[in-house]
Amino acid sequence: MSTTQERAAAQKRHSVGRSVLDTVDERFGSSKFLTSVLDKIFPDHWSFMVGEIAMDSLIVLIITGVYLTFFYTPSGQDVVYAPAAGHIYYPLFGQHMSAAYESVINLSFNVRFGMVMRQTHHWAALIFLAAVIFHMCRIFFTGAFRKPREINWIIGLTLWITVMLEGFTGYSLPDDLLSGTGLRVIYSVVEGIPFVGTWLAYDVWGGRFPGDPFIARLFIIHEFLFPAIIVGLLTFHLMILWRQKHTDFPGPGKTETNIKGSRIWPQYAMKATGLAMLVFGVSFGLGGLIQINPVWIYGPYRPYTVSAGAQPDWYLGWLDGALRLMPHWEFRSFGHEIANPFFPGVLIPGLVFTIMYAWPWIDKKIYNDYRAHNLLDRPRDKPFRTGVGVAAIIFFTVLTFATATDLLANDFHVGFERLIEILQYGVIIGPIAGFLIAYKACQALQRGHSHPIQRPIGGIIIRTADGAYHTLGDHADGHGADHAHAGDTPTGNGHAVPESPAVVGAPVSPAGEAGGERSGGDAGAGDGGTAAEGRSGGPE
């Protein structure tokens, strides 16, 4: 075929492809939608990528979870471990165990990539929880939950709770000694709920613990119910985020009515793709190189073999720690004794999550601020909120340490009862001390480093014979120093021109322009620069 014929054929194919795309565009308006998607602006601050880490980890969880589902047997039926072929783990040979535990042993030793996939799934779950918690901490300390984003805070908090429950159901499925111990603790907590606990535990477990149908029910919850809730909440969360646009940290050219950063294509897409590859590599690297949850060492669950050293994954440690630190008190109500595990296992988590759900409205009352906000706070500018956050972190940390009291007492040769007593005082005194220290530290930082936008521009800059610049009178930085303000450009009239009006408090034009950036619409700086995007509505 000649070059002319090849060119004609290529043009024909291009024409047919273009015709198909035009037909689709005429019916769905796809080109306009894609243009708006590709022009979406994302902030450049690194902390906004933590949410991306969570979503990338979720993808790893879905991939590995689907693989594991093919080889797992969700049954509590009693079997004898005696594989006819393949690798045999002889310490368990001939022992009675559940069919679920046997399938996990075979998955680990006889299924190709089974061990890597199972451990990667576990590591990805830990990374996912860590990213979600860090993401929520950023939102709390910077005030990103304020109007108009209260609903997204509620969705995010519900997502966190659901993910914790999903993680617990996941590591309970192997039915090994460690997971069985955790399920027995949860059974006791549910059974301790006043008036309805006994019937509720009986119905959920399908009889007395462990309950024959419970593993099958747990499998359905872990594989279908919770994943559907997580995907639904995450989709709703992203839809609201897309509609309301991102918050952003204050800075030059940033206002309540615009957002500056990188366009989704190509800058943000390339950055997100690189981060996703990193998360995938780290997850599978950990799964292939670092052992986690070796269920074959723990053995099958038997109540009489439970021993010290049984701790849940770190994200649930605070709940187990609360159970361990609860004093041996007795409470009676309406002639009935309330079981001790009810208070640390149900009441305390209920109060904690209730306060967290209500926090956007509590914060409004504290600061008497009912306006909409798109710019984030610096933690130092909100001492009370920052103090509460630090107190909460200390509270959860002390409870998490309490889940390892048996190990700590053995390793550091401290009396177990004495260690419990120390942590009981610590869970009360620690948060109070943390709040006071954080509150005072924020106030000190405010006094020592006032925000540039609050400083008046004053003084006259003169040039000496040796070419140096000096400031006469009041200086803009408030220290009375006799030198030019850093970053200012001198002019011939003896006054300094601020490098960025938005930084040092120069007036902003009515159109919302600051530092030469547009506050409305899309303003790009090319593929290699930053862009600004207008919001649908300003603060009220």
Per-segment meaning from a language model:
Residues 2-325, 343-540:
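Membrane-embedded alpha-helical bundles that constitute the cytochrome b-like, heme-associated redox core
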